[in-house]
Amino acid sequence: PRGPLRPLCRPINATLAAQNZACPVCITFTTSICAGYCPSMVRVLPAALPPVPZPVCTYRQLRFASIRLPGCPPGVNPMVSFPVALSCHCGPCRLSSSDCGPGRAQPLACNRSPRPGL
């Protein structure tokens, strides 16, 4: 038997962007995020029953890491923290730790030109 066309929920490497409006530089960095397919079910008789929440690929275990934005003026915190996925699972979407919207065609990117070499 063949598996799903999309890979199942798991940690993957992704390039994200970090910026602060008060700092002149945006930098990109690589971290691990949770991504992939989660099986779901659709009710055949949806009439009187509440909708079944669709599971999303989300963090099971994570840690936080930080990077420093260069060139921030005095008084502006140059540190940006981000989650690093250690393990993932299919579960309910928690807005506190997950982006529950549809997938993006493009990864998060800088609004201004990223600093080269970072």
From Swiss-Prot:
Record bears the keyword Disulfide bond: yes
Residue pairs linked by disulfide bridges in the UniProt entry: C9-C57, C23-C72, C26-C110, C34-C88, C38-C90, C93-C100
GO biological process per UniProt: G protein-coupled receptor signaling pathway
UniProt-annotated glycosylation sites, renumbered to this chain: N13
Intracellular or extracellular location(s): Secreted
Alphabetized InterPro entries for the sequence: Cystine-knot_cytokine, Glyco_hormone_CN, Gonadotropin_bsu, Gonadotropin_bsu_CS
GO cellular component term, pick one: extracellular space
UniProt keyword Mitochondrion present: no
Keywords: Disulfide bond, Glycoprotein, Hormone, Secreted
GO molecular function: hormone activity
Function of the molecule: Promotes spermatogenesis and ovulation by stimulating the testes and ovaries to synthesize steroids.
Assembly and binders: Heterodimer of a common alpha chain and a unique beta chain which confers biological specificity to thyrotropin, lutropin, follitropin and gonadotropin.
Family membership noted in the UniProt record: Belongs to the glycoprotein hormones subunit beta family.
Descriptive protein name: Lutropin subunit beta
Organism: Physeter macrocephalus
Name of the gene this protein is made from: LHB
